[in-house]
C-alpha cells in the first residue's frame, strides 16, 4: 500500500484487540486495586502536584507557518490551502486557565530517583466548539505530554502483547521485551533517558499525533476501518523558556547526584534510604512555586508531519525536529502559588484526562490514540467508582 501524508490506517483484526485490551485493563485495575479502598490510575499513578496556570494562544502568523511547512513537506498548493491553523483551540488570541497534573509514568508509586518518564496532563478550560463524541466534559481540551518524544509501541497488536505481559507479571514482561528488542529500546528510552532537575524546566512532547482540522466529508465511524486523511496532522510540545524576551530556551538539566552510568544503585549514589519515600519532584514543585516571584514559562508549539518517515501509527519512531521543528503558537505560564493543600490533592486525583476529551478538529489520530479511546474510559470509570465519586468538570475557578 502506498501511504499518504496526514493519513491514518487501520490494522488487521483491530476491533478484536479493542475487546481484548478492555478485558486486560479491567484485570489490571483489579490486580492493582481490587482489595483496596481507593484506586489510582493504571499508569502515571504517582501524582506530584496539581498546579494552576494559563495557556495563552498567540496571534501567530498563519501564512508564515504555512510557508515554512511548504518548504519542508511535499504538498500541492491545494493541500496547503486546505490547511487552516486558526481553528479550535488555536482559532484566536486568547488566554485560557489550565490545571496541570504533574506525575511519574510508572504503574505504581515509586521513589522519584528511579528511572521513569515524567508527564504533565494539561486541562485547558473555557474551550468552545464542536466536541469529540468521546469527550467526557463540555468546555475543556486535554493535552497529555511526557518528557520523551516516543511511545512504547508500534502497532495495536504489539501494544496488546506488551500490556497483557505487564498484566500477567514482571517476569512475563521482561521475557516479552527480550523477544521484542525495538520495544525494549523504546521502554528504556522512555523511562531512562531523562531524570530532570525540575519538572518546571523540563521539555514535554505529546508522543502521539492529532488532527488539525477535518475534511467536510469526514465520517467519525471510519478511522480504524479504512484509511482516513486529514487536512494536517501535528504533535504538541511544551519547551521551557526564560521569562524575559527573547525567551531563550532553557537547556536540559538533570537531577543533581543522579549517576550517568546505567545500572548504578541510584538510592546509594544519592545517599538515600531505599526504604524511605523519595518525593523529590513534589517537594521541588512546592518549594519553587511558594517563592513570591516564582514564574515559569513554556513555548506551546505544534510539529507537522512533513514526510512518511514521521509515521502517524508507529509511536516508537521519533519525529525529528531538524526535519520538522516545533512552531510556536502560544505560551504556558505558571506563577507563584501554594499547592500543598489536602483538598487540592484530592481534587487532582479526581480529575479525569484523555486525549479524546476535546474539540473535534483536534481529533487524536493513529493506532495508539485509537487504543486510548477504548481503554481510558474503562480505567477512569473504575477509578471513580472505587472512590464513590461522580465526575465533575473543572472550571478553573476552584480554590482550596
Label each region the model flagged:
Residues 1-400:
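Active-site-adjacent core segments of small-molecule enzymes
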Amino acid at each position: 500500500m502506498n501511504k499518504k501524508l496526514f493519513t491514518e490506517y487501520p490494522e488487521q483484526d483491530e476491533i478484536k484487540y479493542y475487546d481484548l485490551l478492555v478485558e486486560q485493563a479491567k484485570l489490571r485495575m483489579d490486580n492493582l486495586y481490587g482489595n483496596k479502598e481507593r484506586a489510582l490510575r493504571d499508569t502515571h499513578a504517582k501524582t506530584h502536584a496539581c498546579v494552576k496556570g494559563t495557556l495563552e494562544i498567540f496571534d501567530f502568523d498563519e501564512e508564515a507557518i504555512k510557508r515554512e511547512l511548504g518548504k519542508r513537506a511535499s504538498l500541492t498548493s491545494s493541500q496547503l490551502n486546505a490547511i487552516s491553523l486558526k481553528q479550535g483551540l488555536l482559532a484566536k488570541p486568547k488566554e485560557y486557565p489550565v490545571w496541570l497534573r504533574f506525575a511519574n509514568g510508572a504503574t505504581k508509586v515509586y521513589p522519584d530517583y528511579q528511572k521513569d518518564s515524567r508527564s504533565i496532563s494539561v486541562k485547558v478550560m473555557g474551550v468552545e466548539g464542536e466536541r469529540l463524541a468521546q469527550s467526557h466534559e463540555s468546555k475543556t481540551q486535554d493535552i497529555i505530554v511526557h518528557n520523551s518524544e516516543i511511545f512504547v509501541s508500534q502497532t495495536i497488536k504489539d501494544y496488546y502483547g506488551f500490556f497483557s505481559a505487564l498484566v500477567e507479571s514482571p517476569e512475563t514482561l521482561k521475557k516479552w521485551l527480550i523477544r521484542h528488542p525495538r520495544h525494549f529500546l523504546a521502554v528504556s528510552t522512555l523511562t531512562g533517558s531523562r531524570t530532570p532537575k525540575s519538572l518546571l524546566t523540563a521539555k514535554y512532547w505529546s508522543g502521539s499525533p492529532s488532527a488539525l482540522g477535518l475534511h467536510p466529508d469526514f465520517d467519525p465511524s471510519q478511522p480504524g476501518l479504512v484509511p482516513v486523511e486529514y487536512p494536517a496532522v501535528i504533535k504538541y510540545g511544551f519547551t521551557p523558556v526564560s521569562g524575559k524576551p527573547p525567551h531563550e530556551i532553557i537547556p536540559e538539566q538533570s537531577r543533581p547526584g543522579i549517576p550517568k552510568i546505567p545500572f548504578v544503585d541510584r538510592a546509594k549514589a544519592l545517599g538515600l534510604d531505599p526504604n524511605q519515600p523519595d518525593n523529590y519532584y513534589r517537594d521541588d514543585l512546592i518549594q519553587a512555586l511558594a517563592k513570591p516571584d516564582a514564574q515559569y514559562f513554556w513555548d506551546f508549539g505544534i510539529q507537522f508531519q512533513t514526510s512518511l518517515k514521521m509515521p502517524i501509527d508507529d509511536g516508537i519512531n521519533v519525529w525529528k525536529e531538524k526535519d520538522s521543528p516545533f512552531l510556536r503558537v502560544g505560551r504556558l505560564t505558571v506563577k507563584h502559588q501554594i499547592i500543598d493543600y489536602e483538598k487540592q490533592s484530592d481534587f487532582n486525583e479526581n480529575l479525569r484526562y484523555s486525549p479524546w476529551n476535546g474539540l473535534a478538529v483536534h481529533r487524536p489520530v493513529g493506532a495508539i490514540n485509537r487504543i486510548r479511546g477504548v481503554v481510558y474510559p474503562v480505567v477512569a470509570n473504575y477509578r471513580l467508582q472505587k472512590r464513590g465519586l461522580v465526575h465533575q468538570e473543572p472550571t478553573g475557578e476552584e480554590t482550596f
